[in-house]
Amino acid sequence: MEFCPKCGAVMFPSEGKFKCQCGYEKDITDKLKDKYRVSEEVEAKETIIFTGDDVNTLPTTRVECPKCGNMEAFWWLQQTRRADESETRFFRCTRCKHTWREYD
């Protein structure tokens, strides 16, 4: 694995370069190509987020529910896109249980 010298995050290969989510890029040299190989390609899949009331153990934050106007919601982060993209922030209203998401 290659780590970003700027922010310390894991860098991912893309288009002949290692790319970091912070924007740093490093060319993949022939020496590095010999060091790494792709062992498996995985396709993105949909996931079920919650199936019960287990959300009640999550932290809360002050944010307005777009459905009922309540000013408190549970929140959590989940990787829903490619690994080199930022996580998605989910909210669930503490009053009406409406769930919505925010992308960075």
From Swiss-Prot:
A zinc finger (C4-type) spans 4-22. This is Transcription factor S. One of its GO terms (biological process) is regulation of DNA-templated transcription. PANTHER family: DNA-DIRECTED RNA POLYMERASE, DNA-DIRECTED RNA POLYMERASE III SUBUNIT RPC10. It comes from Methanothermobacter thermautotrophicus (strain ATCC 29096 / DSM 1053 / JCM 10044 / NBRC 100330 / Delta H). Keywords: DNA-binding, DNA-directed RNA polymerase, Metal-binding, Transcription, Transcription regulation, Zinc, Zinc-finger. Belongs to the archaeal RpoM/eukaryotic RPA12/RPB9/RPC11 RNA polymerase family. Induces RNA cleavage activity in the RNA polymerase. In its presence, the cleavage activity of the RNA polymerase truncates the RNA back to position +15 in a stepwise manner by releasing mainly dinucleotides from the 3'-end of the nascent RNA. The truncated RNAs are able to continue elongation. Involved in transcriptional proofreading and fidelity. Misincorporation of nucleotides during elongation of transcription leads to arrested elongation complexes which are rescued by TFS-promoted removal of a dinucleotide from the 3'-end.
